[in-house]
Amino acid sequence: GSTTAESAALR
């Protein structure tokens, strides 16, 4: 992932 949505989700 490289999107904000993906980053927030994995965090």
From Swiss-Prot:
Q: What is this protein called?
A: Unknown protein 7
Q: Which organism is it from?
A: Ginkgo biloba (Ginkgo)
Lineage summary: Eukaryota, Viridiplantae, Streptophyta, Embryophyta, Tracheophyta
